[in-house]
Amino acid sequence: MLRLVLPKGSLERATLELFEAADLGVARSSSVDYKGTIDDPRVSEVRILRPQEIPAYVAEGLFDLGVTGRDWVEETGSPVVSLGELRYSKATANPVRIVVAVGADSPAEKVDDLPQGVRVSTEYPRLTARYFAGRGIEADVRLSYGASEAKIPDIADCIVDITETGRALRAAGLRIIDTILVSYTEVVANAESYADPARRHAMGQLMTLLTGTLEARDKVLVKLNVSRADYDRVLPLVPA
């Protein structure tokens, strides 16, 4: 019924582990196969693609449902329906942040200290351009295909980059001066597919499985042998 697309790359392992724990395990012929199957009648197709591409493909109707980051929904501006957050990222349950960072020796303490014409290296050119325009700063936004932190100071004056803990930026001698966006992993749907009652119902069931699995990670299963005579006295003492 549902054509599903999952993220490849940094979110891939955590996403596949979540689906496995939710009894929605993805079977593939190899770890580099971009196609998979889920033994569930609600899922007819599984593809694994870069998260940057997923919002546009879902909006276009190539897939009914996708897992990507809020950062890429904002960057692409794709008109998708958000079904909600899945609170995990590459290494932790914390969100990632899209931040503005400068070299440790930069005189800029905040974004408004950056000069007009500031050179910005980023993998998020649209999001970055909108952000600086909103601050009234004319920015020379330069698309980066990675390792943005290595481009300060000779190629760029600052970067807009993604970070989960900030450690990599600090290790590169950079300092964060603002956060543009806090981004969780998100489930997005095609608008027409979501308008179909049967598909929307199936989407809701899958979301319940995934969010329930995440919530259960913070829970502990406690089993007790209690006599019927003591049941009413013991029950209020059990945390739930």
Spans of features found by a protein language model:
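Domain-level signature for soluble enzymes in the chorismate/prephenate branch of the shikimate pathway
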Residues: 1-240
